[in-house]
Amino acid sequence: MESEKSNKMKVVLLSSIAEDLGWNEKFLTIEASQMKVFSVWKLINSKLHQDNIIVSINQEITDMDAKINPNDEVAFMPIFTGG
């Protein structure tokens, strides 16, 4: 029986991050102790460095130390560059 309060979240990868990791959207369930952006990043990725990443929770830019709540959408995208 699934608990009433699930630690499920939607993870979205954009642009080159999606290309590098081979997917662009997943639903994950993680332990309450791992409900920070950095923990999710380490869970889904082992080869890309976090310094070149922008992260958002529910479409608001945040940082790797931000807390994630159940049912949040977490998106990882590369730093924007332009000329």
Each PLM stretch: what is its role?
Residues M1-G82:
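Ubiquitin-like/PB1-type beta-grasp interaction modules and other compact soluble beta-rich domains
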